[in-house]
Curated annotation (Swiss-Prot):
Pathway: Lipid metabolism; phospholipid metabolism
Name of the gene encoding the protein in the UniProt record: plsX
Record family assignment: Belongs to the PlsX family.
Keywords noted in UniProt: Cytoplasm, Lipid biosynthesis, Lipid metabolism, Phospholipid biosynthesis, Phospholipid metabolism, Transferase
Organism the protein comes from: Symbiobacterium thermophilum (strain DSM 24528 / JCM 14929 / IAM 14863 / T)
GO BP terms in the entry: fatty acid biosynthetic process; phospholipid biosynthetic process
Protein name: Phosphate acyltransferase
Gene Ontology cellular-component annotations: cytoplasm
Enzyme Commission identifier(s): 2.3.1.274
Compartments where located: Cytoplasm
C-alpha cells in the first residue's frame, strides 16, 4: 500500500459529514492510498453508512476530545491530547502516517504542526500556501494566515517554498515570483516589504519580478505571490467574497425576466465553466509549508468536494516529494548569522 493520510474528521463546521464523504470519495478513486479518519467513532461510521460504507483502505481511530476555533491554540493543543489534531500529529511524528488534513482551527493546526510534527531545518516559520484562480492560469499565494507579522527573512523563505511548489506541483519551469505590496515600485510598501524586496532580488534561484498590487493578482500578474500572513489572508477572503457576490449578482440579473432567463440558458455552459474556475472547493485546501511532513488546511465551511480536493493536493504533494525538494532547496540558502541561529518560539 502507498501513503497513509490522517484526516481530522471533527474540524469542519458540519463535521464529520464533509470529512467522511470526501475521504470516502478519495479512497475509492485512489485505492493505493490509505486514510485514517480521527474523531467520534459512532458519528464517523454513521456518516460512512450514508456514503455506502467505509472502503477497505479507510480506517477509523476514535478520539474523545475536540479542539474548537474559539480556544487559545497553544493551550488547547497542549491540554487536549486525545483530540483528532493532536493524535493525527502524533501519528505523523511516529511514522504511522505520512500527512495530515484538517478543516479545523488554523491556529491550532499551525501549533500542532510546529510542535507536534516540527519545522524542517532552515525554516523559521511555516506558511499557508493556496491556489487562487485567475483569468489565466492559477496563482500560488503564501502566506494566507499562518504567520502574521512576518520578518523579511521569513518572507524570503516563503518565496523559496512557493517557487518549489510552483515548479513541482503546477509544473512551471520558471515561476514568476512577486511580493504583495501597495504599489509596483521598489520603494512602495511597509518597512517589512521594503526590507524584503532587495533580499528577493539577491536570491539567484528564483525569478523575482518585483512587487505586485492586489488588483493585478486576479489577472495572472505572477505565478507565486508572497505576503505576510495578515494581508495575505485579507486578500484571500476578499477574493472569495467578491467572487461569491459577483456570481450571486449575475444570477439575479440573469433570472430577473423571461428574456434574461433565455439568455442565461444559452450562456449556461460558459457560466458553469467560469463558476467552476472560481469555486474554492475545486482547489482544495492550503498546504502548510515548512514542516517535516505535508499538512493541509481546508476551509471550516468545506463541503465533501472541498475535502476531496484538499486530499488531492495532499496526494500531489506526497507523490511530488515536495517536502524533500523543499528541504533540498532550503539547504542551499546562505547560512544564518550566528546571532540569528536561536530557534524562534512556536
Amino acid at each position: 500500500m502507498g501513503f497513509r493520510i490522517a484526516v481530522d474528521a471533527m474540524g469542519s463546521d458540519a463535521a464529520p459529514a464533509p470529512e467522511v464523504s470526501g475521504t470516502i470519495q478519495a479512497a475509492r478513486e485512489w485505492p493505493d492510498l490509505r486514510f485514517v479518519l480521527l474523531g467520534d467513532d459512532s458519528r464517523i461510521r454513521a456518516e460512512a453508512e450514508k456514503a455506502g460504507g467505509l472502503p477497505g483502505n479507510v480506517e477509523v481511530v476514535h478520539t474523545t476530545q475536540v479542539i474548537t476555533p474559539d480556544e487559545e491554540p497553544t493551550k488547547a493543543v497542549r491540554s487536549k491530547k486525545d483530540a483528532p489534531l493532536t493524535v493525527a500529529a502524533r501519528l505523523v511524528k511516529e511514522g504511522q502516517a505520512d500527512a495530515l488534513l484538517s478543516a479545523g482551527s488554523t491556529g491550532a493546526l499551525v501549533v500542532v504542526g510546529t510542535l507536534g510534527i516540527g519545522r524542517m531545518k532552515g525554516i523559521d516559520r511555516p506558511a499557508l500556501g493556496t491556489i487562487m484562480p485567475t483569468v489565466k492560469q492559477p496563482v500560488f499565494m503564501l502566506d494566507v494566515g499562518a504567520t502574521p507579522d512576518a520578518r523579511p527573512e521569513w518572507l524570503v523563505q516563503f518565496a523559496l517554498m512557493g517557487d518549489i511548489y510552483a515548479r513541482e506541483i503546477l509544473g512551471l519551469s520558471r515561476p514568476r515570483v512577486a511580493l504583495l505590496s501597495n504599489g509596483t515600485e521598489a520603494e512602495k510598501g511597509n518597512a517589512v516589504v521594503k526590507a524584503t524586496y532587495p533580499l528577493l532580488q539577491e536570491l539567484p534561484s528564483i525569478h523575482f519580478i518585483g512587487n505586485i498590487e492586489a488588483r493585478d493578482v486576479p489577472f495572472g500578474g505572477a505565478d507565486v505571490v508572497v505576503a505576510d500572513g495578515f494581508p495575505g489572508n485579507v486578500l484571500l477572503k476578499t477574493y472569495e467574497g467578491v467572487a461569491m457576490a459577483l456570481f450571486q449578482s449575475l444570477k439575479e440579473a440573469l433570472t430577473g425576466s423571461p428574456l434574461t432567463a433565455v439568455g442565461a440558458a444559452l450562456a449556461k455552459p460558459g457560466l458553469k465553466k467560469m463558476a467552476k474556475r472560481f469555486d474554492y472547493t475545486e482547489y482544495g485546501g492550503a498546504l502548510l509549508l515548512g514542516l517535516k511532513a505535508p499538512v493541509v488546511k481546508c476551509h471550516g465551511s468545506s463541503n465533501a468536494r472541498a475535502i476531496y480536493s484538499g486530499l488531492r493536493v495532499m496526494k500531489l504533494a506526497l507523490e511530488g516529494r515536495v517536502i524533500d525538494r523543499l528541504a533540498e532547496a532550503i539547504a542551499q540558502l546562505p547560512a544564518k548569522n550566528p546571532k540569528e541561529e536561536g530557534d524562534p518560539p512556536a
